[in-house]
Amino acid sequence: MARYRRNGAGRAWLDSLHGLLADRLEQWQLDLDLVPGSMPWSGHGGIVVPVRQEDGSPAALKIAFPHDEAKVERHALARWGGHGAGALLSSDEASCAMLLERLDAGRSLADVPLDDAAVVWGGLVRQLALAPDPRPEWREFAHIAARAEQWSDELPADWDQLGRPFPRWLLEAALEVCQTRGAVGRRSAHDLLVHTDLHFLNVLARPG
């Protein structure tokens, strides 16, 4: 979260976070469910706060910094419908807020032996790969071909700016993949919705 202090937009969002949280708690009739002295969970793009709904059932309130992926995450979760991903209970486009099924933040796929984790991960990849349907929100998802072309432009400069942290051959191999996927993706007629950040720490267990 500290990275948002580096620019004006990020600082403005951090300053507004308390108000955004208070507004969602009121609008969705939620109570904080934090253990005394503990902090909300924070990640690369936002915070997640454990809450209780009006009927006492547990949930998680996620508020993300407004960026392209955060703006369409609610559409992906709605499409998955709680199968292979946490269920979306409610969302607010203006604040990039979502009320989610609460998973067990203390149990991730990173805790599972690698051979077993690979089987679970592969099953999730297949389960979450969905073909488009006529709903208009599909047009809001970024195409991996465009992302690959973007990386082709950005990776060399980033690699140089970061002090060339790995060998040039590895950079060139990554660029080759990006350039190939960009070209192939533009010609493909078989689009699928995929999870683009499915590392083991992002695969959490359901309670119980």
Q: Each PLM stretch: what is its role?
A:
Residues 52-59, 206-208:
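Active-site beta-strand-loop-beta-strand hairpin of nuclease catalytic cores
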Residues 1-36:
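Juxta-kinase regulatory segment immediately upstream of eukaryotic protein kinase catalytic domains
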Residues 45-51:
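ATP phosphate-binding glycine-rich loop
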Residues 201-203:
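Hydrophobic residue at the +6 position relative to the catalytic HRD Asp in the kinase catalytic loop
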Residues 13-25, 133-196, 206-207:
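An alpha-helical support segment within catalytic cores of ATP-dependent transferases
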Residues 18, 44, 55-99, 107-128:
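A conserved alpha-helical element in kinase catalytic cores
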Residues 37-42:
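Protein kinase glycine-rich loop
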